[in-house]
């Protein structure tokens, strides 16, 4: 059984009538009036099969698609003058510099806090709604922030390959072991002294939180950022214990009438 291949006729750019005949092979054409070589038809056995791709010949390698080029690293020509970060667009740099300038143009409608970025405000508002969209895959607990979930997942770690040489505790990461030894076992565990009192602290964040005790409380209506505000007079404090001391010492007479 022979396959019938249709005959195609078209005109070339030089206005010559070209006829494609079957059996001439690729790249060979028959002009009208030319003699067509005769060859016996090959017997067809079984269905047509595609050539094997396991061992491609020179023609197959030539027709293979080129490999995709590796994408070059993104260009970040806009560098922050206050830190080492760089950005691709000026708008990204302008948004980043809000963190250095202390500007917080995104206030929370439910509390006096304000934030530099809309994403920080959106994450903060989850604390007011009570939503916990980040569940733990190992226990029923859920968290409002991914960072809280990441900190909680350490409790489910199967191994703790970094033991403390001074106590039976062990840790999942070397950074946690270093922080533990710095806090509990170092002789100079408090290298950050307070400039206003004899106290000293292990970490700069602890010192910064303590220095709020020496700063005067913000007046009512002030734009200064404070975490704990008195509901009676409007004064704000950096720590909750200072707010409780203020309420016991200033508003106990008014509410209970124990003093003149």
From Swiss-Prot:
Residues 67-78 have a biased composition (Basic residues). GO terms for molecular function: DNA-binding transcription factor activity, RNA polymerase II-specific; RNA polymerase II cis-regulatory region sequence-specific DNA binding; zinc ion binding. Keywords: DNA-binding, Metal-binding, Nucleus, Repeat, Transcription, Transcription regulation, Zinc, Zinc-finger. Belongs to the krueppel C2H2-type zinc-finger protein family. This is Zinc finger protein 575. A zinc finger (C2H2-type) spans 78-100, 106-128, 134-156, 162-184, 192-214, 228-255. Residues 51-64 have a biased composition (Low complexity). InterPro entries: Znf_C2H2_sf, Znf_C2H2_type. It comes from the Eukaryota. The keyword Metal-binding applies. GO terms for cellular component: nucleus. It is found in: Nucleus. Residues 22-81 are annotated as: Disordered. May be involved in transcriptional regulation.
């Amino acid at each position: 059984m022979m396959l019938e291949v249709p005959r195609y006729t078209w005109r070339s750019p030089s206005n010559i009538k070209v006829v494609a005949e079957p059996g001439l092979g690729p790249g060979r054409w028959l002009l009208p009036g030319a003699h067509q070589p005769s060859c016996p038809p090959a017997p067809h056995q079984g269905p047509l099969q595609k050539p094997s791709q396991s061992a491609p010949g020179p023609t197959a390698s030539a027709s293979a698609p080129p490999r995709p080029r590796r994408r070059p690293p993104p260009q970040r020509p806009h560098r922050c003058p206050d830190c080492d970060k760089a950005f691709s667009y000026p708008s990204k740099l302008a948004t980043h510099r809000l963190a250095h300038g202390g500007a917080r143009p995104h206030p929370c409608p439910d509390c006096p806090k304000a934030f530099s970025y809309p994403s920080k405000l959106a994450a903060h508002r989850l604390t007011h709604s009570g939503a916990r969209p980040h569940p733990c895959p190992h226990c029923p607990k859920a968290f409002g922030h991914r960072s809280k979930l990441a900190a909680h997942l350490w409790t489910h770690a199967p191994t703790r390959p970094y033991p403390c040489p001074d106590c039976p505790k062990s840790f999942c990461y070397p950074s946690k072991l270093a922080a533990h030894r710095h806090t509990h076992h170092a002789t100079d565990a408090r290298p950050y002294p307070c400039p206003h009192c004899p106290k000293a602290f292990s970490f700069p964040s602890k010192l910064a939180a303590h220095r709020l005790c020496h700063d005067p409380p913000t007046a009512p209506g002030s734009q200064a950022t404070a975490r704990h505000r008195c509901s009676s007079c409007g004064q704000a404090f950096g720590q909750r214990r200072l707010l409780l001391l203020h309420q016991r010492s200033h508003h106990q007479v008014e509410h209970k009438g124990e003093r003149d």
